């Protein structure tokens, strides 16, 4: 049986697409090994059939501290890859994959890079010269070296099975009640706990007859304050620190307000659920902004930058969309036009390389 290594670390945005790819590869008869860092350990569940290995690499701004750590991690990765003897390694980007990718270069294991964002990350860019193929989600990806253009294959993003099972949720689900789902992705969003309730207050002042249902991710220490505001506004709500099966919330929502991580965007694209994106300004290479702007430019979503946003601006945007449902329908249609079966297309590419 041929063995394949998938490498991802850091956030759920890297982890869950890699698991979805692993599930498809297992269905095709491969033995799948998954190298992750300690931060991803919390996402592992009993029903995942891939074989996990934890190889941690702590980031440091001090090069004299980081290089010894990297050297040790690379040696561990070389030993691990030598024992597994994979036919190919697939890297999902981010600094946690560095040691495994260096080990693959040293052992001459074929490398495939997967970039879910519209802006090629620094780590993925570094390894483009060693990669056999570069799988991308956005056709006009930014920051791609000229020499690497002949290596790219547009596979689209990879979406979890429970989200794929939803199919399309496009179109209004309740004419009398408009449901907004607010979440900050796997990294959360403290900003939303203040911004969203303030925006909803302004929205209700402008349109008192509006019937809203709010589903919102919020930290426990913010929930009491948020509940008080929604109760005073006579709004039904659902608050949680984390949604274990986000497909249930997607299914009920008419509009999403979220960050613009690649995994979130690919899930919303797959099911045709329109969103207002507030990109995380501190995201590496500002990639969330480029993700959201790409969708806005193709009329498949809306991008509001955190530095320029206010409760009033957000309320106006929500009111505009609620008052003009044709805009929401068009955005849903444009999202679905971009949908791809990324888990299958990337699996096909892996088989070509093997």
From Swiss-Prot:
<feature type="binding site">
    <location>
        <position position="288"/>
    </location>
    <ligand>
        <name>UDP-N-acetyl-alpha-D-glucosamine</name>
    </ligand>
</feature>
<feature type="binding site">
    <location>
        <position position="117"/>
    </location>
    <ligand>
        <name>UDP-N-acetyl-alpha-D-glucosamine</name>
    </ligand>
</feature>
<keyword id="KW-0961">Cell wall biogenesis/degradation</keyword>
<dbReference type="GO" id="GO:0005975">
    <property type="term" value="P:carbohydrate metabolic process"/>
</dbReference>
<keyword id="KW-0808">Transferase</keyword>
<dbReference type="GO" id="GO:0051301">
    <property type="term" value="P:cell division"/>
</dbReference>
<dbReference type="GO" id="GO:0008360">
    <property type="term" value="P:regulation of cell shape"/>
</dbReference>
<feature type="binding site">
    <location>
        <begin position="11"/>
        <end position="13"/>
    </location>
    <ligand>
        <name>UDP-N-acetyl-alpha-D-glucosamine</name>
    </ligand>
</feature>
<keyword id="KW-1003">Cell membrane</keyword>
<dbReference type="GO" id="GO:0071555">
    <property type="term" value="P:cell wall organization"/>
</dbReference>
<keyword id="KW-0132">Cell division</keyword>
<keyword id="KW-0573">Peptidoglycan synthesis</keyword>
<comment type="pathway">
    <text>Cell wall biogenesis; peptidoglycan biosynthesis.</text>
</comment>
<keyword id="KW-0133">Cell shape</keyword>
<protein>
    <recommendedName>
        <fullName>UDP-N-acetylglucosamine--N-acetylmuramyl-(pentapeptide) pyrophosphoryl-undecaprenol N-acetylglucosamine transferase</fullName>
        <ecNumber>2.4.1.227</ecNumber>
    </recommendedName>
</protein>
<keyword id="KW-0328">Glycosyltransferase</keyword>
<dbReference type="GO" id="GO:0030259">
    <property type="term" value="P:lipid glycosylation"/>
</dbReference>
<dbReference type="InterPro" id="IPR007235">
    <property type="entry name" value="Glyco_trans_28_C"/>
</dbReference>
<feature type="binding site">
    <location>
        <position position="186"/>
    </location>
    <ligand>
        <name>UDP-N-acetyl-alpha-D-glucosamine</name>
    </ligand>
</feature>
<dbReference type="GO" id="GO:0050511">
    <property type="term" value="F:undecaprenyldiphospho-muramoylpentapeptide beta-N-acetylglucosaminyltransferase activity"/>
</dbReference>
<dbReference type="InterPro" id="IPR006009">
    <property type="entry name" value="GlcNAc_MurG"/>
</dbReference>
<dbReference type="Pfam" id="PF04101">
    <property type="entry name" value="Glyco_tran_28_C"/>
</dbReference>
<keyword id="KW-0131">Cell cycle</keyword>
<keyword id="KW-0472">Membrane</keyword>
<dbReference type="GO" id="GO:0051991">
    <property type="term" value="F:UDP-N-acetyl-D-glucosamine:N-acetylmuramoyl-L-alanyl-D-glutamyl-meso-2,6-diaminopimelyl-D-alanyl-D-alanine-diphosphoundecaprenol 4-beta-N-acetylglucosaminlytransferase activity"/>
</dbReference>
<feature type="binding site">
    <location>
        <position position="160"/>
    </location>
    <ligand>
        <name>UDP-N-acetyl-alpha-D-glucosamine</name>
    </ligand>
</feature>
<dbReference type="GO" id="GO:0009252">
    <property type="term" value="P:peptidoglycan biosynthetic process"/>
</dbReference>
<dbReference type="Pfam" id="PF03033">
    <property type="entry name" value="Glyco_transf_28"/>
</dbReference>
<dbReference type="InterPro" id="IPR004276">
    <property type="entry name" value="GlycoTrans_28_N"/>
</dbReference>
<comment type="similarity">
    <text>Belongs to the glycosyltransferase 28 family. MurG subfamily.</text>
</comment>
<dbReference type="GO" id="GO:0005886">
    <property type="term" value="C:plasma membrane"/>
</dbReference>
<comment type="function">
    <text>Cell wall formation. Catalyzes the transfer of a GlcNAc subunit on undecaprenyl-pyrophosphoryl-MurNAc-pentapeptide (lipid intermediate I) to form undecaprenyl-pyrophosphoryl-MurNAc-(pentapeptide)GlcNAc (lipid intermediate II).</text>
</comment>
<keyword id="KW-0997">Cell inner membrane</keyword>
């Amino acid at each position: 049986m041929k063995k394949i290594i998938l490498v991802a670390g850091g956030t759920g945005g890297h982890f869950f697409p890699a698991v979805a790819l692993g599930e498809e590869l297992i269905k095709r008869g491969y033995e799948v090994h998954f190298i992750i860092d300690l931060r991803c350990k919390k996402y592992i569940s009993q029903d995942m059939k891939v074989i996990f290995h934890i190889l941690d690499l702590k980031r440091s701004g001090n090069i004299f501290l980081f290089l010894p750590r990297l050297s040790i991690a690379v040696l561990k990765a070389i030993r691990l890859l030598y024992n597994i003897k994979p036919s190919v390694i697939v890297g999902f980007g981010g600094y946690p994959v560095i040691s495994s990718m260096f080990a693959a270069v040293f052992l001459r294991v074929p490398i495939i890079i997967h970039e879910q964002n519209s802006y090629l990350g620094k780590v993925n860019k570094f390894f483009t010269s060693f990669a056999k193929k570069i799988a991308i989600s956005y056709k006009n990806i930014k920051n791609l070296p000229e020499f690497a253009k002949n290596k790219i294959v547009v596979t689209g993003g990879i979406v979890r099975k429970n989200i794929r099972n939803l199919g399309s949720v496009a179109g209004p689900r309740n004419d009398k009640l408009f449901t907004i789902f607010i979440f900050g992705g796997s990294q959360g969003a403290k900003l939303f706990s203040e911004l969203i309730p303030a925006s909803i207050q302004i929205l209700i002042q402008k349109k008192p007859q509006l019937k809203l249902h709010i589903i919102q991710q919020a930290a426990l220490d913010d929930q009491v304050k948020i509940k008080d505001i929604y109760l005073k506004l006579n709004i039904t709500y659902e608050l949680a620190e984390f949604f274990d099966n986000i497909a249930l919330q997607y299914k009920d929502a008419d509009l999403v307000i979220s960050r613009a991580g690649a995994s979130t965007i690919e899930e919303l694209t797959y099911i045709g659920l329109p969103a207002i994106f507030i990109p995380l300004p501190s995201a590496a290479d500002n990639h969330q902004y480029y993700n959201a702007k790409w969708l806005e430019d193709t009329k498949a979503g809306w991008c509001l930058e955190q530095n320029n946003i206010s409760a009033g601006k957000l309320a106006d945007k929500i009111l505009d969309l609620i008052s003009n449902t044709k805009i929401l329908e068009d955005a849903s249609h444009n999202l679905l036009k971009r949908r791809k079966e990324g888990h299958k297309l990337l699996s096909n590419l892996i088989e070509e390389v093997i």
